[in-house]
Amino acid sequence: MYLQPKKVRWRKQRRGTLKGKAFRGNKLAFGEYGIQALDRAWITQQQIEAVRVALVRSLKKGAKVWIRIFPDKPYTKKPNEVRMGGGKGDPEGFVAVVKPGRILFEFTGVPEEVAQEAFTIAASKLPIPVRLVKYGEFTFKY
């Protein structure tokens, strides 16, 4: 099941800019390990779900996973082979706006080798470079 808002105030939003670094959500809050973004991007609801499934499958039982981002920005798309103009396209889905330094996922309850393997699998599902951070480690190397 994909994450998305229950209600949106506006069906269509402007794209906005992706400037600066993440000053909120850049520290570990729940788990022992975290996946931190090193670049800026829109992460779609499908990508978030793919990473969640990959983490849950690779971490096995006894582990807990937290999703620290939420896709709350609607994005639009025009149909294929449609001429330019004619207004903005229809809403296609939702994205989470991610800036460098943002913690995307957290997990706990596994040894470091298992965490590293799970991170490698999860990182391949994301469109941006990410790094694994541990609790107590300096997290501002982005």
UniProtKB/Swiss-Prot annotation:
Membrane-crossing residue ranges in chain numbering: none
Superkingdom, natural source: Bacteria
Q: Per its UniProt record, what Pfam families does this chain match?
A: Ribosomal_L16 (PF00252)
Key words of the record = Ribonucleoprotein, Ribosomal protein, RNA-binding, rRNA-binding, tRNA-binding
Q: Which GO terms describe its cellular component?
A: cytosolic large ribosomal subunit
Q: Which GO terms describe its molecular function?
A: rRNA binding; structural constituent of ribosome; tRNA binding
Q: Which GO terms describe its biological process?
A: translation
Cross-referenced InterPro entries:
Ribosomal_uL16, Ribosomal_uL16_bact-type, Ribosomal_uL16_CS, Ribosomal_uL16_dom, Ribosomal_uL16_sf
Task: Name the job this protein performs.
Answer: Binds 23S rRNA and is also seen to make contacts with the A and possibly P site tRNAs.
For this protein, the record's NCBIfam families field holds: rplP_bact
Per UniProt, subunit arrangement is: Part of the 50S ribosomal subunit.
Family (UniProt): Belongs to the universal ribosomal protein uL16 family.
Instruction: Identify this protein by name.
Output: Large ribosomal subunit protein uL16
